């Protein structure tokens, strides 16, 4: 089942640049939050039939969207998570996953926009006091990260980070998101990484004694379950 719906920002300069990730696939994922009290996707995503119409034209399907500073900015993420026009929490994909985005800025060592390039997801903030929305939004973000890890094995749990952590590594601008939101509900990025990490695999070894006449039948059933069988 699709986790995202596509609403590509084809008019955005970042989409038009179509700079392919230099390593061929994403090295990780950055989770952002928007810093604006508006949980509805229409604020950022140009898809009126799904998100509803943006009456102000402030979505990101323009060459340079209006940034939080109120000025046109070269900016674009890969996806937004927020509410559609019915109030359902959805994920909108606005860039192909393997195109470099323009979303985390520069740090002292470079930028995770480019090299290595990270997928970057914005979670639409509300007033930061609605636990139900918080759990739905970050639950969907976790599901999306799991799907991306499956599709791109280059993404490891330790490289699913926040904008704040990307800054601390020296590869993003000085922002604190989304830790301020996570902290409101007693969570942090270690919690998020724990829920997206693949479950640890363990090896089971067992012995079973059956009547000789039933050995082949039992062996066949065990092999169907993926077990190695040795009859002695």
Where are these regions (language model features)?
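A structural micro-motif
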Residues: 89, 155-158, 227
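Basic/polar, cationic surfaces and motifs that engage anionic cell-wall
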Residues: 2-10, 17-23, 27, 116-119, ...
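Generic "edge-of-domain/loop-turn" microfeature
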Residues: 38, 86, 128, 211-213
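N-terminal catalytic cores of peptidoglycan-degrading enzymes
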Residues: 1-114
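Short strand-loop junctions, especially beta-strand C-caps/beta-turns
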Residues: 34, 124-126, 205-209
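Solvent-exposed beta-strand motifs enriched in subsets of small alpha/beta binding domains
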Residues: 200-232
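General small-molecule cofactor/ligand-binding pocket signal
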Residues: 92-95, 161, 230-232
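Sec/Tat-exported extracytoplasmic proteins
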Residues: 33-35, 83, 145-153, 226
């Amino acid at each position: 089942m699709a986790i995202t719906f596509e609403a590509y920002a084809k008019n955005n300069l970042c989409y038009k640049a179509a700079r392919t990730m230099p390593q061929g696939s994403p090295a990780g994922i950055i989770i952002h939050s928007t810093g604006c009290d508006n949980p509805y996707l229409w604020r950022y995503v140009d898809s009126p039939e799904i998100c509803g119409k943006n009456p102000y034209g402030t979505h990101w399907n323009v060459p340079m969207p209006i940034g939080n500073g109120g000025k046109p900015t070269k900016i674009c993420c890969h996806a937004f998570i927020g509410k559609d026009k019915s109030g359902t929490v959805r994920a909108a994909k606005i860039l192909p996953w393997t195109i470099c985005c323009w979303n985390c800025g520069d740090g002292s060592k470079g930028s995770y926009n480019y090299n290595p390039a990270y997928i970057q997801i914005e979670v639409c903030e509300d007033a930061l006091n609605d636990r139900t929305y918080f759990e739905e939004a970050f639950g969907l973000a976790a599901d999306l990260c799991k799907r991306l890890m499956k599709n791109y094995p280059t993404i490891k749990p330790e490289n699913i980070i926040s904008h704040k952590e990307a800054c601390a590594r020296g590869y993003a601008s000085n922002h604190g998101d989304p830790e301020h939101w996570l902290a409101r509900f007693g969570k942090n990025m270690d919690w998020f990484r724990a829920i997206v990490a693949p479950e640890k695999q363990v090896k089971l070894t067992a012995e079973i004694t059956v009547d000789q006449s039933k050995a082949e039948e039992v062996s066949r059933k065990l092999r169907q379950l993926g077990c190695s069988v040795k009859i002695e």
